[in-house]
Amino acid sequence: MDERDELRLGCETAYIDGSVASNSLYCPQFITNNYKSGKKVLSTIENELLKCDKFQISVAFITMGGITPLLQTLKELEKKNIPGEILTTNYLDFSEPKALKKLNGLSNITLKMYDVKAADEGFHTKGYIFRTGEVYQIIIGSSNMTSTALTSNQEWNTRIISTEHGKMAEEIISEFDRLWNSQHTFGFDDFYENYKEEYNIVKHQRDIAGQEKIVSLEKYNLKPNSMQIAFITNLKKIIDAGENRALLISATGTGKTYASAFAMRELGFKRVLFLVHRGQLARQTKKSYERVFEKSVSMGLVCGGYREYNADYVFATVQTLNRDEHLLQYNKNAFDCIILDEAHHVTADTYQKIMKHFEPKLWLGMTATPDKRDDNIAGKNVYELFNYQIAYEIRLQQAMEDKLLCPFHYFGITDLSIIGDDKADHDFSMLTSDERVKHIIEKSCYYGYSGDKVRGLIFCSSIKETQELSHKFNSIVNPETGKCYRTIALNGDATEQERQSAFERLAMNENEANTDKQPLDYIFSVEILNEGVDIVEVNQVIMLRPTQSPIVFIQQLGRGLRKADGKEYVVILDFIGNYCNNFMIPIALSGDRTYNKDNVRRYVMEGGRIIPGASTVHFDEVSKKRIFESIDKANFNDIKLI
């Protein structure tokens, strides 16, 4: 059957009788976003791009959030020298100059802008044209090149198929060419600088207007969201049933601190102890509670130099309270409720000493990773210590469904082939070689970040590696700023003050720089940033180490998932080497704990279609090959690997 016959049969299926069997490649389709059905506009566009020998796109709006998920595919097309023409507009000054510059930087793409002001007319086209031989696949409908339009919005598009001589293709391509060659259409060099200036003026005006409408959080009577309401309801039931222990399992960034504060307010507990393992976190938690309670209860710290023992609500570090001079300030019934943050550590001796001292009405544990624990008590686990009373559980997948987290764009990128599992000293020079550093910087610049500057965390295999890579980064000019990168290595020997200073510098804006303190671009670390660190501004996470467990992988990915103003998404760059545990990456991302090899393979191929919301998952071809080899070799019955 030739292509014309295939096309006739496809049209019969689409327009006359849906029961007629035909080749889906030649069948017109309705294209929308519904991840539960494995459908995303983005995935369809990606597939067509990878098959075509030429593409043309005409859309009103282009943003970084829209093109970032396509960057890996577009880079592959550049390598194959597949030509592309992209036409956009200055309508409403909405398209982001940063995105336009990124597209224009690809050697195979020609970018033009239609000037609606000069033409004195609107521009609302949303069309994607893909040519393969003599056949055109054309997607027309409602989707611009923006993040939500391509992944999660309610969008209606149709994919039509036509030969190059078909009337539909002829008319659409003719119209594209008319706009492309219009006197009101300008090449990148002719429009970019003027448009960038106009865009920045309009953006500044919008930002000012937005700020005028914002009222500080402290002026609101904060109310719990749906997740927090469900948690409080379940917690009440547990207490009413006579239980005195409960566990909240909540993915990083979903608001478990506020959930606990709302619960304490709802339950009317007069005295509460909140235990954390970092002084910075104690201070942050206290501020969150103050927003919920305002001045209805007194609050104090027992950490660092603070000794505010008699406050109604005490926020303490485990390390401080574990010492007798502080612990013995309290009798066993001093608190109505004791909250244990990062509760997967409660099996450790330091926590157990505190737990044996107190007898509150309620022990409340909170963790994102209950299956990760300190095995200091033989046979005990976190669930058992909280009497298997789970007040609420929300894992990464559900949190994304509920839009509680910042969307992420994950890219599995091939690490240099010289990197293997052996991290002995003789391999250290390879891990920190100039070639690898160049590779990392090239990819981090290409895939970028959301916002005005990079605020990144880089996870390495060893302390020595963090120090050497940070040193090398600091001697290399950042192509975006024209200045050398500003990074530090932060590890276990860093003081509380050093950590706090590093976190503040990473969050700083360029205009806040002074002679005493400069902003940071990256913090290098091994493990100390895995948990208990809330830097909401993080917009890029780079993984330079093998994945040892799905739990640690999600902890490190989670460092970038907190929402923040001006942060539309976070970019996750995972440099994948020849590691035997590569199969853990799709297991971690999918949340699928069936350990079915076919399911894991399928996620590598189709994860981008089924991940909730605006988040996306991409693996380059070599990374896919390495993961598939790892899956084939792995023994999923060996629980130690899981």
Mark where each language-model region is.
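Long, largely alpha-helical accessory region at the distal end of helicase-like NTP-driven motors
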Residues: 191, 198-224, 235, 439, ...
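Conserved helicase ATPase core of P-loop NTP-dependent helicases/translocases
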Residues: 283, 300-301, 306-307, 326, ...
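Post-DEXD/H (motif II) to motif III coupling segment of the RecA-like Helicase ATP-binding lobe
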Residues: 344-408
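Conserved segment of the helicase C-terminal RecA-like domain
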Residues: 550-555, 559-589
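Walker A/P-loop
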Residues: 240-264, 278
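Conserved interdomain linker/interface between the two RecA-like ATPase lobes of SF2 helicase motors
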Residues: 388-457
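Conserved strand-helix element at the start of the C-terminal RecA-like helicase core
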Residues: 272-281, 432-474
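PLD/PLD-like phosphodiesterase catalytic module centered on the HKD motif
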Residues: 1-225, 229, 344
